[in-house]
Amino acid sequence: MAELKSLSGDSYLALSHSYTATGHAYAAARGPETTRGFGASGPGGDLPAAPASRVPAATVESSGEQSGDEDEAFERRRRRRGSGVAVDARRRPREQRSLRLSINARERRRMHDLNDALDGLRAVIPYAHSPSVRKLSKIATLLLAKNYILMQAQALEEMRRLVAYLNQGQGLAAPVAAAPLTPFGQAAIYPFSAGTALGPCPDKCATFSGSPSALCKHCGEKP
């Protein structure tokens, strides 16, 4: 610091010019970096700002045309998609309505068929179509049909048992009925023949062996 103070003003200016010349020489040595905008110093030794990048006008115009074409293509796609969405939006309510109508018609046919079947079932079940009985519900009709079927099954089972019992009894009684009666048996049951002519009451009483006429009611009556 003492040496710098001892220097005069002219000496200080000469020293500053020598530093500036040294800076120019250094900038010339860094030529490639200077062309890239890093090296050259101004008259006061300051480095200049980096030059702004320049894009060719043809490139700018081509990019503008491309962006315009892309915008038009995007607009066409948007319009096409919008028209398709609008058509789908108009078509969807019609399809939904037709589908709903078909489902309702199918359900209506199913209920009609079910009601017809239940009416036919009520017609063959006793106590279900009497004038004093109101129309049974679906569940009541099915329960009554179930009970009626069970009752018929029990009746058929009892009938089978009865038929089997009768067939077994006929098998046991057949030999007894087939045995012929002996003459003694015939006399014991019917002592006179079919060709014997019966006379008055005393004569009829006399035809029986061992039967006195006093026991005959007609013979004991007075005339």
Curated annotation (Swiss-Prot):
CDD domains: bHLH_TS_bHLHe22_bHLHb5. It holds the Pfam family HLH. May function as transcriptional repressor. May modulate the expression of genes required for the differentiation and/or maintenance of pancreatic and neuronal cell types. May be important for rod bipolar cell maturation. Residues 98-152 form the bHLH domain. Keywords: DNA-binding, Nucleus, Transcription, Transcription regulation. Expressed in brain and retina. One of its GO terms (molecular function) is protein dimerization activity. SUPFAM superfamilies: HLH, helix-loop-helix DNA-binding domain. GO terms for biological process: negative regulation of retinal cell programmed cell death; positive regulation of transcription by RNA polymerase II; post-embryonic eye morphogenesis; retinal cell programmed cell death; retinal rod cell development. The gene is Bhlhe23. GO terms for cellular component: nucleus. It is found in: Nucleus. Its main location: nucleus. The keyword ATP-binding does not apply. Residues 32-93 are annotated as: Disordered. Disruption phenotype: Disrupted rod signaling and profound retinal dysfunction. Coiled coil: none annotated. Signal peptide: none annotated. This is Class E basic helix-loop-helix protein 23.
